[in-house]
Structure formats: C-alpha cells, structure tokens
C-alpha cells in the first residue's frame, strides 16, 4: 500500500494550528477544510486526462480535461463531512457518496448504520475522507463497502493517522492509497490518537 505523509509547509502549518486546544468551532472547520483541499491536490496528481478542442478567445484551442467518470467523494459520517467542502472546492463536479459508521466505545469496532453510493461506482475513483485514521476499523469497513459496489480505485485522505491503523489497512487492502497530513505516535487506552486533534467530530459540529 502506498502511504503518503504530505509534508508541504502549508499543510504542516495548518495542521499545527488544528492541534491547538482553544480553537473555536469555526476555526477548526475552516482549517480542516483547508487541509482537505491541499490533500486533494496531492491525491489527484495521477488522474488521467484527455485532449479536447474548445472555442478559445482567439479560435479553437486544445486543452486537457480529466478523463472518464472522474471522482466520488466518500465522507465517513459524521466527522468526514468537515473535510467535504474542501475537497469539493477542488473538484466541484464530484459526486458524493456517504457512509455512516459509529464506533462502539467498548469494542472500538465500527458499526454501520447508513450507506448511499452514486452511480457507476466501478468506473470512478473514490476519495474516502475522515479526519482520523485510528484503529483502521472504520476505513476497513468503508473500503469493503466500496469494493462491494465494484469500485476498485480507492484513496483515503486523513488529517492524522497512527501506525496501527495504517498497518491494518495495508495488510487487508494493499491496493488502497493513503494521503495523510501527519502520522502521529500512537493510540491511547481509549483508542484516541496521540498527540492527535481531540475529538474531530465534536470540534467540527460544536458538540461534546
């Protein structure tokens, strides 16, 4: 599995701001969206393009456009929604598919409660978005749902991840690419990332 820890200075600066404990909901949302936008730029650098001819201001001109059915964004509810606008800023024509999962706080395993995928999934590149890749359980479940639709080109975009989760995904799905702003140290006894960002869902939605 290809794992890209994106070390761009803008990403690292904004991630540092995200780690501050006293951010307002508005500030956290804005920064999460900005980092998602930059990760999208990295994750789409290998998309295929094709030549088309359009009418330019001085006559016909040949330009490049992304080839095929393009992209579906797959936010994992609920925290993944906090990254969605940033991705859509870069790919405004992308279709949005949704996966609803919550974590059982005793077993730390994901429980699925909702899924809705766009059409022609087998022809699309899926960009899974979620602020955290912790145990890897939610991502694993989402990948399996996507592959059940026929989707085979899958990438994940995360603000932070830990080696434990990355190893789980690498073992089960070596064909999936991961783009992450930071590979953090470890999980604590409650399954939260350290140093991490805290509870990203609560920070994005202003809940506790």
Curated annotation (Swiss-Prot):
Taxonomic path: Bacteria, Pseudomonadati, Thermodesulfobacteriota, Desulfuromonadia, Geobacterales
GO biological process assignments: UMP salvage; uracil salvage
The keyword Nucleotide-binding appears for this protein: yes
Binding annotation for 5-phospho-alpha-D-ribose 1-diphosphate: 78, 103, 130-138, 199
Membership in a protein family: Belongs to the UPRTase family.
EC numbers on record: 2.4.2.9
Co-factor remark: Binds 1 Mg(2+) ion per subunit. The magnesium is bound as Mg-PRPP.
Gene behind this protein: upp
Binding-site positions, uracil: 193, 198-200
Protein name: Uracil phosphoribosyltransferase
Keywords (A to Z) from UniProt: Allosteric enzyme, Glycosyltransferase, GTP-binding, Magnesium, Nucleotide-binding, Transferase
Listed pathway(s): Pyrimidine metabolism; UMP biosynthesis via salvage pathway; UMP from uracil: step 1/1
């Amino acid at each position: 599995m290809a794992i890209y820890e994106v070390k761009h200075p803008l990403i690292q600066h904004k991630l540092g701001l995200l780690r501050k404990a006293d951010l307002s909901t508005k500030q956290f949302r804005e920064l999460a969206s900005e980092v998602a936008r930059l990760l999208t730029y990295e994750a789409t650098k290998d998309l295929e393009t094709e030549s088309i001819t359009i009418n330019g201001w001085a006559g016909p001109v040949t330009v490049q456009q992304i080839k095929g059915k393009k992209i579906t964004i797959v936010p994992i509810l609920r925290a993944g929604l906090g990254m969605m606008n940033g991705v859509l800023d870069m790919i405004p024509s992308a279709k949005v598919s949704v996966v609803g999962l919550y974590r059982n706080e005793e077993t730390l395993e994901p429980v699925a409660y909702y899924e809705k995928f766009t059409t022609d999934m087998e022809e699309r590149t899926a960009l899974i978005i979620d602020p955290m890749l912790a145990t890897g359980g939610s991502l694993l479940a989402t990948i399996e749902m996507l592959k059940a639709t026929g989707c085979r080109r899958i990438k994940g975009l995360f603000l932070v991840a830990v080696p434990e989760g990355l190893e789980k995904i690498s073992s089960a799905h070596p064909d999936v690419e991961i783009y992450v702003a930071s590979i953090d140290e470890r999980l604590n006894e409650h399954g939260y990332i350290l140093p991490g960002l805290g509870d990203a869902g609560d920070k994005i939605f202003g809940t506790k």
